Amino acid sequence: MGRAPHAQPGTASNALGLFDWDVLERLLGAFHSGPGNSGTGSEPDVLVAQRGRLVDVPPPRSLKEVRQLMARSLGVVLRKAERHDARLAALAEAFARDLPGQVHVQLYVTPAGTQTFGWHYDDEEVFIAQTLGVKDYYIRENTVAPAHRRSRQPDFSAVRRETSPLLSARLIAGDWLYIPARWWHLVSSVEDALSISIGVVPRAPALRRQG
């Protein structure tokens, strides 16, 4: 882990039921039934985005509203979803057992022919399970924004100076993909798609053991 991206076709079949349209509808239902619905005392943290920019619209509170946003080529992200679903919480706990550290689960809803975010990188290790539809992932090693220059507001336009080789992977339902921390990536939805993204910030000793 930590050296290069790695795709595993067909190895995420157990994750298919963790995020589908029914799960999305149930999670969004927390807006209606209040804090008690999720057992966490808070509503889902939902973002709406398009091509790397947040869109200032009310967050969807039903599957119907999600469909309406998708018809406008807008993507939806549910952050820290492990706080609102027992099975997603168990998934996060499983990752934390294997790779001790801070783990969060994000859920992505992306319409066909769109990119929710532009070229960017994450400070955490990213593991992706595709649960519905098809996505193309484009990945490059980050040689222009070294880790020792971390910033709260990273300059993603630096990708224009990147000269590392371009890698790609097409994910269909049931596939896994690992993207190392701080590697550039761009995601394009070929079909309407649902995916689970597990972000892990490992403790330093764990990185040394597994690196």
Residues covered by each model-derived region:
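Conserved beta-strand-loop-short alpha-helix elements that form
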Residues: 178
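Fe(II)/2-oxoglutarate
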Residues: 1-7, 13, 159
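Active-site region of the double-stranded beta-helix
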Residues: 13-175, 183-211
